[in-house]
Amino acid sequence: MLPIVYKRLAEEWGIHVTHEDCVQYGRSVGNWPAFEDSPGALQYLKKYFKLVILSNVDNESFQASNAKLKVQFDAVYTAEDVGSYKPAPRNFEYMLEKLDSLGVKKEKVLHTAESMFHDHKPANEFGLASCWIYRRHAQEGFGATMHPGGMPRVDFNFNSMHDLVKAHQEQLRDK
């Protein structure tokens, strides 16, 4: 998908790119940096929760990205596994079917993500609780993702994974 998008954007902007340029860009996902707070936050959350990934990348790219996160996920479901990309309903159906077979009911899922379009809108449609990591809180728009239309409902909203961890720690202290 990324090589096609790269080619179309280059054409739209009047930039010449070769087929190899497009393929190389598509393979670059595994080299993209993780958000600075993600490894530590995920390692902390892993102590308390099962962690599952529903990703819009292929398996090879995810493996390279995951090496930067330094956490063992309980399950990983990629677009390559599913055969489609979020926000397609099939991705969420696939994840929920797999989680159910692992004994995890959808009522126990907290879908945590940044993209309103790719994640929170379909999470709403499947009745999942959701947590918006609103990293663009100081900026307008939705970044590289499409506007979701109407704003989906979210159960929690944090500006970073670090803020999510702080809220969890505060909740534990208050018990």
Predicted regions and their residues:
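Surface-exposed cleft-lining segments at the edges of enzyme active sites
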Residues: V23-W32
